[in-house]
C-alpha cells in the first residue's frame, strides 16, 4: 500500500530472523544423546549444548538434572540456510497454530536425513524441532546489560505479521489450525 504511492517502507519495520533454535530431545542420557549431538554438529557446524531434566518423572525413567536433550542456536545466513532446508522437508506448509502470539514460529521434522545429511548406521535417525525467533531492528535493546529498554507495542511482532512474512518470503502455505 505504501509502495503504490511512491513511498518507501520504513526499514526499521522490516522483519528478519533473529535466531533459529534446533532441539533434539532423546529423553535419556548416554549413547543416544551423544549421537544426537553429532547430528546437530553435522547440521550446524557448531558445538551443541546439553539440556537437563527439570524434575523427576518416574514413569518415563527420567531423573532430575539428568541430561535428556541437546540443542543449538544458529544466527545469520547459516540460520536462513538451515531453515530453508527444514521448510523444504515440510513442503513450505505450516499450521496456523505453529505461530505464537509474539510472532515466532516452530515446527518439527521426523527424520534428520531429509535435510541432506548422509545416513550413518552408527548414528541412526533422529527427529528434530525448529523454532524461529523473528525480530526487527532495535530489538537488541532488550538484550543489552546496561540501560535495557522495552519494545513498544507498535514495534512488537504480531501473529498475523509473522504469518504474512512467512507467506511472502518463502511462498509458504498456512493451513488452518487443528
UniProtKB/Swiss-Prot annotation:
GO terms for molecular function: rRNA binding; structural constituent of ribosome. The keyword NAD does not apply. GO terms for cellular component: cytoplasm; nucleolus; nucleoplasm; ribonucleoprotein complex; ribosome. It is found in: Nucleus, Nucleolus; Cytoplasm. One of its GO terms (biological process) is positive regulation of signal transduction by p53 class mediator. The modification N-acetylalanine is found at residue 2. Pfam families: Ribosomal_L5, Ribosomal_L5_C. There is a cross-link at residues 38, 52, 154 (Glycyl lysine isopeptide (Lys-Gly) (interchain with G-Cter in SUMO2)). Its main location: nucleus. Keywords: Acetylation, Cytoplasm, Isopeptide bond, Nucleus, Phosphoprotein, Ribonucleoprotein, Ribosomal protein, RNA-binding, rRNA-binding, Ubl conjugation. The modification N6-acetyllysine is found at residues 52, 85. The keyword ATP-binding does not apply. The modification Phosphothreonine is found at residues 44, 47. Component of the ribosome, a large ribonucleoprotein complex responsible for the synthesis of proteins in the cell. The small ribosomal subunit (SSU) binds messenger RNAs (mRNAs) and translates the encoded message by selecting cognate aminoacyl-transfer RNA (tRNA) molecules. The large subunit (LSU) contains the ribosomal catalytic site termed the peptidyl transferase center (PTC), which catalyzes the formation of peptide bonds, thereby polymerizing the amino acids delivered by tRNAs into a polypeptide chain. Belongs to the universal ribosomal protein uL5 family. Component of the large ribosomal subunit (LSU). Part of the 5S RNP complex, which is a LSU subcomplex composed of the 5S RNA, RPL5 and RPL11. Component of a hexameric 5S RNP precursor complex, composed of 5S RNA, RRS1, RPF2/BXDC1, RPL5, RPL11 and HEATR3; this complex acts as a precursor for ribosome assembly. Interacts with PML. Interacts with MDM2 (via its RanBP2-type zinc finger domain); negatively regulates MDM2-mediated TP53 ubiquitination and degradation. Interacts with NOP53; retains RPL11 into the nucleolus. This is Large ribosomal subunit protein uL5. It comes from Pongo abelii. The gene is RPL11.
Amino acid at each position: 500500500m505504501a509502495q503504490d504511492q511512491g513511498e518507501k517502507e520504513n526499514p526499521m519495520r522490516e522483519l528478519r530472523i533473529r535466531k533459529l533454535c534446533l532441539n533434539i530431545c532423546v529423553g535419556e542420557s548416554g549413547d543416544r544423546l551423544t549421537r544426537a549431538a553429532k547430528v546437530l554438529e553435522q547440521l550446524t557446524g557448531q558445538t551443541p549444548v546439553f539440556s537437563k531434566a527439570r524434575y523427576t518423572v518416574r514413569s518415563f525413567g527420567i531423573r532430575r538434572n539428568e541430561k535428556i536433550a541437546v540443542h543449538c542456536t544458529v544466527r545469520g545466513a547459516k540460520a536462513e540456510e538451515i531453515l530453508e532446508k527444514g521448510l523444504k522437508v515440510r513442503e513450505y506448509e505450516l499450521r496456523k497454530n505453529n505461530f505464537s502470539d509474539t510472532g515466532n514460529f516452530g515446527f518439527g521434522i521426523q527424520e534428520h536425513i531429509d535435510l541432506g545429511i548422509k545416513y550413518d548406521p552408527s548414528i541412526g535417525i533422529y527427529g528434530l524441532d525448529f523454532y524461529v525467533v523473528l525480530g526487527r531492528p532495535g530489538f537488541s535493546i532488550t538484550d543489552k546489560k546496561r540501560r535495557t529498554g522495552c519494545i513498544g507495542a507498535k514495534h512488537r511482532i504480531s501473529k498475523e505479521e509473522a504469518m504474512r512474512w512467512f507467506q511472502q518470503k518463502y511462498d509458504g502455505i498456512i493451513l488452518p489450525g487443528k
